[in-house]
Amino acid sequence: MASSPPIYNLEQYGTNCSEEYSNFYENSKYWIQCLWLIPTLFLLVWIIITTRVRYPSQYSNLPYWILTADCVVSIILILLDLFVVRLFLYFPQLCSKFSTIFINYPIISDIYFPIYNYARVFKTGSQCGMILSRLFCVLIPFGHDEKLRRHIPLFLTIICILPILVVWNTVISEKEVVFWYGGFFVIYHRRVGWVSLSKLHLTFIFVSISFILISSLLLMRHLPIESAVNAERRVITNSIFIIVAFFFQAAFQSFYAFFRYTDWYPRFLVDFQFIIYDVMTVGYPLIFLNFAKEFRNHVFLKSNRKGRTLMELRSMSKPFNNTMPRQESPSPNYDSILA
């Protein structure tokens, strides 16, 4: 049986650690990226504490459970970036010692490489789950919390399983240490030759973009008139951010999937792809906080005397006939679902 081709043009990479690159310049890339990764890491931890420790009863609905899962996966992704992937790529002074460890103990790569890619793909599915839960809140305005709460384990299970369909080949495939810019990182050689991580992720992204577009249009179509202006603005802004972030990921995956074997494949894309994925990792919790006033006040320990709590909003919720025209559909609490 013919072996599958490597996913990289290996001639682009060195065979051992290089001392040709400036330690200061390469280290600076790492420290600059730490400027947004480390604050985001602390923010994500605090969001989890807020939703699961400080106010677990108020944030027990589906969107906040999806947010919690997304935060946990983002924390794993950032920790792997800070202490493994970007650290060993941008610190040439660590290359000689730690590349030997990775080569001699391949179990390290076998564990972290699939987890790292799983965490990247996870956000594609979690955003679909988030927009779907919001759509249910509009289509089923009365008692949607209770109905969705019964299915939270099912929703979370599906969201967690979907990325496995994209990254499973990285689990069973051989990993290899390659050298780049004085540092090193890990690649994989596909055991199942036709199953490409980049092409599967690209397909997953396009499906997610289509799903988010359709769901956002349906969401705006069924919003009641009382909350239409502010809620539509939030839906549009949130959807645009997610779609633009996914578009950049799709552009990178497309370029990588079809041109990585060429000699002219730009070397800077290895660095730039980190920024592309950081847009979603760093940006989404900020977007969420920006549009969820109640939640933002809880996260930043602000007084909420002038606002209504989530429990108050739920108690004021009124049913309406979703077959009625949009302008005749009364409901007082819809901007709470667009958190």
UniProtKB/Swiss-Prot annotation:
One of its GO terms (molecular function) is transmembrane signaling receptor activity. The chain crosses the membrane at residues 30-50, 65-85, 98-118, 152-172, 200-220, 239-259, 268-288. It comes from the Eukaryota. InterPro entries: 7TM_GPCR_serpentine_rcpt_Srg, Nematode_SR-like. It is found in: Membrane. Keywords: Membrane, Transmembrane, Transmembrane helix. One of its GO terms (cellular component) is membrane. It holds the Pfam family Srg. One of its GO terms (biological process) is sensory perception of chemical stimulus. It is a multi-pass membrane protein. Signal peptide: none annotated. Residues 319-339 are annotated as: Disordered. The keyword RNA-binding does not apply. Belongs to the nematode receptor-like protein srg family. PANTHER family: SERPENTINE RECEPTOR CLASS GAMMA-7, SERPENTINE RECEPTOR CLASS GAMMA-RELATED. This is Serpentine receptor class gamma-7. The gene is srg-7.
